[in-house]
Every structure is written in C-alpha cells, then in structure tokens.
Amino acid sequence: MAFLKKSLFLVLFLGLVSLSICEEKERETKEEENEQEDDNREEKRFLSLIPHVISAIPHVVNALSNLG
C-alpha cells in the first residue's frame, strides 16, 4: 500500500512539473507575440509621421532663409 501511495505521489508530482513547464512556455510565447505586436505598432506610428515631417520641411527652409 505504501508503494502505491509513493508511486501515485510521484506520478502527480511529475504531472504538475510538466504542466508547470508547459504553462511557462505558453506564457513566454504570449510575451514574445505581445512584444512583436508592440514593435509593429511603434513602426506604424513612426511611418504615419513621415508625411507630416515632409510637409514641414518647406516651412523650416523658409524660416531659416529669413534668418540669414
């Protein structure tokens, strides 16, 4: 009977350990996906600013030419 209890505890322990490892890998995968999404959002924000910067260049050039 004691052998059966020890075996059952061992099986439960190993099952919990493997479950914990799987959950940790899943968590890491989700974190990596979130980081990639954040990077994509930042890139899109940057790209949306380019037309505004380009349209501001003539104003900056005019302001600099008026100073000189």
Swiss-Prot record:
<keyword id="KW-0295">Fungicide</keyword>
<comment type="function">
    <text>Weak cationic amphipathic alpha-helical antimicrobial peptide with weak activity against Gram-positive and Gram-negative bacteria and fungi. Has been tested against E.coli (MIC&gt;217.69 uM), S.aureus (MIC&gt;217.69 uM), K.pneumoniae (MIC&gt;189.00 uM) and C.albicans (MIC&gt;217.69 uM). Shows a moderate hemolytic activity.</text>
</comment>
<comment type="similarity">
    <text>Belongs to the frog skin active peptide (FSAP) family. Phylloseptin subfamily.</text>
</comment>
<dbReference type="InterPro" id="IPR016322">
    <property type="entry name" value="FSAP"/>
</dbReference>
<keyword id="KW-0399">Innate immunity</keyword>
<keyword id="KW-0165">Cleavage on pair of basic residues</keyword>
<keyword id="KW-0929">Antimicrobial</keyword>
<dbReference type="InterPro" id="IPR004275">
    <property type="entry name" value="Frog_antimicrobial_propeptide"/>
</dbReference>
<keyword id="KW-0204">Cytolysis</keyword>
<dbReference type="Pfam" id="PF03032">
    <property type="entry name" value="FSAP_sig_propep"/>
</dbReference>
<dbReference type="GO" id="GO:0031640">
    <property type="term" value="P:killing of cells of another organism"/>
</dbReference>
<keyword id="KW-0878">Amphibian defense peptide</keyword>
<dbReference type="GO" id="GO:0050832">
    <property type="term" value="P:defense response to fungus"/>
</dbReference>
<dbReference type="GO" id="GO:0005576">
    <property type="term" value="C:extracellular region"/>
</dbReference>
<keyword id="KW-0027">Amidation</keyword>
<dbReference type="GO" id="GO:0042742">
    <property type="term" value="P:defense response to bacterium"/>
</dbReference>
<dbReference type="GO" id="GO:0045087">
    <property type="term" value="P:innate immune response"/>
</dbReference>
<feature type="modified residue" description="Leucine amide">
    <location>
        <position position="67"/>
    </location>
</feature>
<feature type="signal peptide">
    <location>
        <begin position="1"/>
        <end position="22"/>
    </location>
</feature>
<keyword id="KW-0732">Signal</keyword>
<keyword id="KW-0964">Secreted</keyword>
<feature type="propeptide">
    <location>
        <begin position="23"/>
        <end position="45"/>
    </location>
</feature>
<keyword id="KW-0044">Antibiotic</keyword>
<protein>
    <recommendedName>
        <fullName>Phylloseptin-SP1</fullName>
    </recommendedName>
</protein>
<keyword id="KW-0354">Hemolysis</keyword>
<keyword id="KW-0391">Immunity</keyword>
